[in-house]
A protein has these predicted regions:
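N-terminal, Lys/Arg-enriched amphipathic/low-complexity engagement segments
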Residues: 57-130
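Gram-negative bacterial Sec-dependent N-terminal signal peptides
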Residues: 4-25
Length: 349
């Protein structure tokens, strides 16, 4: 086994404001009562403004490859995405097996309503008119057949292809680290050059693109509907900039099938979204492979990169989140180096 490099991430949950920390989050609202999941292989298409045309055909979303492998194609539509909620009663839009690959699309925020031409006033209205609801458009849920509570879901990011445009904004006087500075808010739309993998933020200011999903997570164990904003033991809105193609997420499973979502797609991000947002985009292709890991339970998510492991901690109290991240790091080191937790803590120093 080679050297281990550790990066710890902490998330602070506070009420309604973006604050210091790698990921800064809104307060978790209470659950909305909901029924048990309907674990059917299809989802009824009921797009507003169109007549119902019947259930989507699962077989028409699956491509069989040589060697017995399967690739599932999941477009982002109003029928395959949710706006701002995780809900473990949501009917799965796709059913796959452990080891399968999924090629999925994602939307821009608020069901593709934040696109070039949308004003900051309109963006503010999308936030203030729907209290408790997150801004993220989430593709899913995806039901993984073998996944059961107590298992771990391993999600490997194979490839990410963004759209050619993106945005950065902060809502007037409400969120981010600068609400008093930008009381009128601001929105900026950007062209993403996918050949050079850069964007010109300002004349002469070029930002390299490093796309990653800001949100990827599974259903909570508690029934009900929850905002997409806070992360937690189910992963979710982690906003970890190192979660790029070539890395792997390990997340505990809490409900049968795991129920996997992804969205909040980023083209690039600093180490924290201090003005509220990163370079927000949508993905033409988010290519992932899912595997179910049995007999190796986790209590919090981890990310494996080609050169490091990332551990996490989540709490409303930043100090408690930091303590969780430290404990998770010591736990990982003790597992991989077969040393005591006490020696692992010394090694961390």
């Amino acid at each position: 086994m080679g050297p281990i490099t550790m990066l710890s991430r902490i998330a602070l949950v506070v009420g309604g404001a973006l604050t210091a920390g790698t990921a800064a989050l809104g307060q978790t609202p209470g659950p909305t009562p909901s029924t048990a999941p309907q674990l059917s292989p299809t989802a009824t298409i009921t797009t507003p403004g169109y007549p119902a045309i019947g259930p989507a055909d699962q077989k028409l979303r699956t491509v069989n490859l040589p060697g017995g492998k399967r690739v599932h194609l999941l477009p982002a539509t109003l029928d395959t995405t949710q706006w701002g909620w995780f809900d473990n009663a949501q009917v799965p839009v796709l059913r796959v097996n452990s080891g399968d690959t999924i090629v999925m699309e994602t939307m821009m925020h608020s069901h593709n309503q934040v696109v070039p031409g949308t004003s900051i006033e309109q963006i503010k209205k999308l936030r203030t008119d729907f209290p408790g609801r997150g801004p993220h458009s989430l593709t899913g849920p995806i039901y993984i057949e073998e996944a059961q509570p107590g298992d771990v879901l391993k999600v490997t990011l194979n490839k990410i292809v963004p759209r050619s445009y993106a945005t950065n904004f902060n809502v007037p006087g409400l969120f981010g680290e600068f609400p008093n500075v930008y009381q009128d808010g601001q929105v900026k739309y950007l062209y993403l050059d996918l050949e050079s993998m850069t964007t010109e933020f300002l004349p002469g200011v070029v930002v390299p693109l490093r796309p990653f999903p800001g949100t990827m997570g599974v259903a909570r164990k508690e029934p009900g509907r929850y905002s997409s904003v806070p992360p937690g033991e189910y992963a979710g809105n982690m906003d970890i900039r190192d979660f790029v193609a070539g890395t792997t997420l390990y997340v505990p499973v809490y409900v049968p099938g795991a129920l996997l979502w992804s969205g909040d797609s980023h083209a690039a991000q600093g180490n924290g979204e201090v003005n509220l947002t990163a370079i927000e985009t949508a993905y033409k292709e988010l290519n992932i492979t899912v595997e179910v890991v049995k007999g190796k339970p986790l209590d919090l998510p981890r990310i494996e990169t080609p050169k490091s492991w990332i551990t996490m901690g989540f709490d409303q109290d930043l100090n408690k989140a930091w303590a969780q991240a430290k404990a998770q790091t010591a736990k990982l080191l003790s597992e991989q180096r077969t040393i005591s937790a006490e020696r692992a803590e010394v090694l961390m120093a």
